[in-house]
């Protein structure tokens, strides 16, 4: 069986993805700040395994509580995982903070917190796991970004910037990882029904469930796709907006802002 470490597995997409991978034969180490939620995840996986006909082919679940902002704690967790599993085949960074924000409600400390968790946390994660994969010249690194990182969007002041930085970083390191036989996947979901998107007070077209999202991601990971984006009816619209010039893009975004965000 292959071994996987998921950081940010206590809720949302990370939670469902941990379940999906474990049922499909991965030994999963699930990490997050909330030990309580990790125990809920563990219990759900154990229950799912009992009700699965092919339970002998399911993987095991192990939980390790850790905060991605704490580099030394994250390092200790990674060392513990390697001591117990020796080799990790797949790592997934799913930690994130999301808050709607524009200039009228610009919270500097919250903005720094969003950047620190979403992007600096990924840097901490990447710095720790890369030597293991480079040494083995094998493995798979994945991270959950967002279509909000494609281009600047209203109400996404800090969150969009953090995801854009993540996408840019992954594009930059892809050639070096590929040269060392290491797969890299950047996961860009559209709107997924989670506790994060529950805060939104604007229309969310093509909203999908966490379970649907985990299915899309699992299929993409198994195919070792560089970008896993979904639902495509929505993401292709944003991909088009990504490539058009500013003189076309900005009037479109300005119109959306005036319709949905001005009070």
Spans of features found by a protein language model:
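Residue(s) in the substrate-gating loop at a strand-loop-helix junction
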Residues: 146
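Conserved NAD(P)H cofactor-binding loop of Rossmann-fold oxidoreductase domains
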Residues: 94-99
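Conserved glycine-rich cofactor-binding loop
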Residues: 10-11
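C-terminal helical subdomain
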Residues: 186, 202-237
